[in-house]
Structures are given as C-alpha cells and as structure tokens.
Amino acid sequence: ERYWSEENHDFFVTSAAIESAGYCRWPRLKEIMEFSRSMHYQKLGLAFCAALKKEAAVVERVLRNNGFQVVSVICKTGGLDKSRAGVPEECKLQPGQFEAMCNPIAQAELLNSQDTQFNICLGLCVGHDSLFYQYSKALVTTLVVKDRVLAHNPVGAIHYADTYFKDLLKG
C-alpha cells in the first residue's frame, strides 16, 4: 500500500525501470545518472569522505559532464575537533592532537540549504552515514561504502567469512 502513495510510487517504479534497463550492463554510477534523469532531478548532492576526495572529484566531473548540477560537501566540513562533540581523547587516532571530526549532520544541512533533489553518499563512516541519511531532506543513495581494509569493498569479507575472515568475524 505504501508503494502506491504519491511520494513513493514514481520513485519505486522508476527504480524498477532503471534496474531492468541496465541490468548487468550499467555500473552503479550510470544507474544513478539514469535514475536521476528519469526522475527529472537536475541538482544532486554529493556527501563524501575526505579519504575519497579523488574519487569524489571523478564522480562530480562525470555528473557535471552528463548535465547535472552538483553540490558537494566533504565530511570534515566545519573543521571542528572531535572533542567538541564529546569524543574522548583515547578514541582519537592520535590522542592529544587536533583531529577534525566528521560532520555528517552539517553535510546534510548544507545540502538541504542548497535544495538538492537527490543526494549521493560516497564513503562516509559507519554511523556517520546513518546520521547523514537521517538529516538529509532529499532521499539518499549510496555509491560507495567505506571499508578501509578491503579497498571499499565490504562484500569481500562476506565472501570469505568462512575462510580468510573466519576468526576475525566469529561472534
């Protein structure tokens, strides 16, 4: 019943149409562009991790070259020390040093202020991505998830859960 609501129906049907059109032929970035075109989205938001700024630049260039307006915002926006958000020193990578915090709520608010129509999440940390989704007014899709060990391919740990990662993943 919820799929028939005005706010969900076109979005869901368009998603199914894009899946069908590009099935096993289009990479996810192409799917995002085709979905956005089909939904008549012109202004896209890109919330990205500082560790993936090169990849974010490529994504932004590809989107712009395909006719989209892109508003991008890096995770460290605001340049606030983690301690300002209550992170204990022992939880910093280098205790006692300035360490800029990720700021997913500010990322969402900045994109909200620019009235983006659809937002793309590129490599935000676990939990930070959730806060970004929660505070984004526009719906969000994920292009890249962060996995510092597996070159941002977390499915690798799933494929090898019974072999290479068996001891690491046992509960």
What spans do the regions from the language model cover?
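Long, charge-dense
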Residues: E55-Q107
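Electropositive, gly/pro-rich neighborhoods at or near active sites that engage anionic ligands
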Residues: E1-K43, A50-K54
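Gly/Ser/Thr-rich loops at beta-strand to alpha-helix junctions
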Residues: G22-W26, F48-A56, G78-G79, N119-S130
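Conserved acidic residues
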Residues: Q42, Q117-F118
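Short Gly/Thr/Asp-enriched flexible loops that form oxyanion-binding sites at enzyme active sites
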Residues: E55-V62, D129-A138
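A short, acidic, amphipathic alpha-helical segment used as a generic capping/interface helix at domain edges
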Residues: M101-T116, L124-H128
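C-terminal functional extensions of proteins
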Residues: T141-G171
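Short, acidic/small-residue loops that bind anionic groups at enzyme active sites
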Residues: Q69-K76, L131, Y135-N153
